[in-house]
């Protein structure tokens, strides 16, 4: 699988799972209506896990322009590949969102709250204080990137008899998923934690 296709499929699955849980919790007449923030943050974390496991062996599973750009700035990813990765991520995100809309179309039609409908596809601040909202997103994105840099550091070693690769595509999916989960639980209440440019 090419890195472009891996980023596309991994991001599509991430958005399908993440947007799907928001639709399930926030739209009218769903089985998960009203399940709450813990359900949303947990499913987003598991969506990250799924996307990383699928894309990791082929692309490193950036699944996020902030990761691609951050790794390029840090000198661990070639700038010449950034546009290809981001294009795959954007197309994958659009396809994932389209699938969420198709699956929940009847529930979008049954929902009278335009903010709930919009919230399936984007984040927005709970209290509009843009400098504080920006700070929260910046800190959350820093936390995500710090963990990603730690996991992808070539100086880290792991001794084992296993032949499984260590990195974002295997064992590395667990700390990335937990990081997204804890960012959502701790910092996501203010903006919905896009942690993405």
Residue ranges and their predicted role:
Residues 1-197:
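Membrane-interface helix-loop junctions and terminal tails of multi-pass membrane proteins
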């Amino acid at each position: 699988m090419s890195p472009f296709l891996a980023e596309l499929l991994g991001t599509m699955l991430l958005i399908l799972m993440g947007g799907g849980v928001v639709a399930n919790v926030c739209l009218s007449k769903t089985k998960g209506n009203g399940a709450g923030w813990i359900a949303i943050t947990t499913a987003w974390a598991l969506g990250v896990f799924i996307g990383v496991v699928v894309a990791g062996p082929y692309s490193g599973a950036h699944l996020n322009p902030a990761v691609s750009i951050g790794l390029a700035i840090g000198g661990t990813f070639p700038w010449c590949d950034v546009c290809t990765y981001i294009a795959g991520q954007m197309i994958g995100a659009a396809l994932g969102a389209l699938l969420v809309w198709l699956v929940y179309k009847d529930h979008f039609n049954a929902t009278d709250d335009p903010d709930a409908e919009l919230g399936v596809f984007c984040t927005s601040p709970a209290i509009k204080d843009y400098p504080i909202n920006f700070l929260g997103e910046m800190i959350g994105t820093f936390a995500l990137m710090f963990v990603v840099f730690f996991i992808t550091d070539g100086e880290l070693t792991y001794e084992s008899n296993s032949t499984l690769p260590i990195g974002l595509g295997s064992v590395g999916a667990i700390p990335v998923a937990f990081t997204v989960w804890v960012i959502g639980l701790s910092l996501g209440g203010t903006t919905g934690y896009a942690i993405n440019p």
